[in-house]
Design a protein with these regions (language model features):
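Membrane interfacial helix motifs at helix-loop boundaries and amphipathic/re-entrant anchors
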Residues: 38-49, 63-65, 234-257, 315-339
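Hydrophobic secondary-structure segments that place a key small or acidic residue at a functional site
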Residues: 92-95, 100-128, 135-198
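Membrane-proximal extracellular/periplasmic loop immediately following the first transmembrane helix
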Residues: 45-96, 106-112
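A hydrophobic alpha-helix feature that marks transmembrane segments and, especially
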Residues: 33-37, 254-286, 294-299, 355-356
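C-terminal membrane-exit region of the final transmembrane helix in multipass inner-membrane proteins
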Residues: 3, 340-372
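Mechanotransmission and gating elements of multispan inner-membrane complexes involved in transport
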Residues: 177-258
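N-terminal Sec/SRP start-transfer signal
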Residues: 1-29, 40, 372
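Transmembrane alpha-helical interface segments in multi-pass membrane proteins
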Residues: 283-329, 335-347
Length: 372
């Protein structure tokens, strides 16, 4: 990489420009990936934490299963509980509702909505006690007149353990305040199955569970067909959330398009770059340099620029993401930082490799202008 290092030292302005563009694209891709991850977490974290190997939803006569329309009758519950190979069946009810905190404790840090007595949107989740411990099942209260709140619900309502809140016209005492749990962008409020069924009926439902969290190794398809239900892994079940499908579909398409734009932009920069170095490359080839060594030299130079630009961009993503985490649903994890950075590096090198073809395949004498 003798020529590459000399070029990097003596053409600093060019490489600062290219590196800045790479850093800005990385910042855009990384920040969008973090925002997508944060929005996804606020959409589906409660579903992913349900205590089952697979989640069972009602199979409609037409179309795909949906959390919003699913109701599991007692016959289906009994069918899954009696199926060979089933270890545990946990009926879970999920419905959107609203809660108010008319008597928030003085020690709680109430939000503006809670302080004014306004209703707060929550996801009412009916959970039995004794299920396998997860962040969601740990919220389950022990009595029908109690509720468990996720940290987000407690913060929005401005309450703590021992305070009373009103849900669908009925008062409950807060028995548990747990970790972060979300369903369809609303914080989770856990109730006993009996209390949830009563709340669901007050909201116009029939009180039947929404989903079954099933553990074991039965014949999933056969049991599903006999009970009119559909079983899928928790991750695959996310497609049954309409908000998740539309949200992730649009944001994912934007990320893919940004990756494509990054490859084109980096490739265009390196195309102009290699055209400007055509004379140097031709001299090296005329002196006996192999095509492989020239490719390694150019790609090594591109890799240095990409690593520096991506590194600066990722540092900005981590810093801004940490600052924005309190105001935006932003997720900092290897999936939203390392994966986009690696993809940017691969796509950038691919663009640089395509840009090298016209020079590395040219005849040295022609590149030197011998035809003149």
């Amino acid at each position: 990489m003798f020529v590459a290092w000399r070029d990097l030292r003596f053409a600093r302005g060019r490489f600062v420009l290219i590196g800045s563009v790479v850093a800005l694209i990385t910042l855009l891709v990384g920040f969008l990936a973090g925002l997508t991850g944060g929005l996804a977490s606020q959409n589906v974290s409660a579903v992913l934490d349900l205590p089952g190997d697979r989640l069972v939803l009602q199979q409609p006569s037409t179309g795909q299963p949906s959390f919003g329309d699913s109701t599991i009758g007692q016959r289906a519950v009994d069918g899954w509980q009696a199926a060979p190979g089933v270890d545990d069946v946990v009926p879970v009810g999920i419905v959107q509702g609203r809660a108010t905190a008319p008597g928030a404790g003085s020690g709680a840090a109430g939000s503006g909505a809670a302080a004014s007595g306004a209703a707060v949107g929550v996801a009412l989740v009916g959970l039995p006690t004794g299920a396998r411990s997860t962040p969601v099942t740990d919220l389950a209260p022990g009595r029908d007149d109690q509720v468990g709140l996720s940290s987000g619900a407690a913060a929005d309502l401005g309450v703590q353990v021992g305070d009373r809140i009103t849900v669908t016209g009925t008062d409950y005492r807060v028995a548990v305040v747990g970790g972060d749990a979300w369903y369809s962008h609303t914080p989770v409020l856990a109730m006993t199955p009996e209390a949830w069924a009563a709340a669901d009926r007050r909201l116009g439902g029939d009180g039947a569970p929404t989903v079954l969290a099933v553990s074991g190794s039965p014949d999933w398809d056969a049991v599903g067909a006999s009970t009119g239900t559909s079983a899928a892994s928790p991750l695959a079940s996310l497609t049954a959330l309409e908000t998740f499908r539309s949200e992730i579909g649009s944001l994912g398409l934007m990320i893919v398009m940004l990756f494509g734009v990054s490859a084109l932009v980096v490739g265009a920069f390196f195309t102009v770059w290699t055209m400007q170095r055509a004379g140097d490359v031709a001299v090296l080839k005329a002196l006996g340099a192999s095509t492989g060594s020239l490719v390694r030299d150019a790609l090594g130079q591109a890799l240095v620029v990409l690593v520096l630009g991506i590194g600066v961009g990722m540092l900005a993503v981590v810093g801004l993401g940490a600052l924005a985490g309190g105001a935006l649903p932003f997720l900092l994890s290897p999936v939203t930082t390392v994966v986009p950075a690696a993809a940017m590096a691969v796509l950038g090198l691919a663009g640089a490799a395509v840009a090298l073809r016209t020079v590395t395949s040219a005849d040295p004498l022609t590149a030197l202008g011998s035809n003149r």
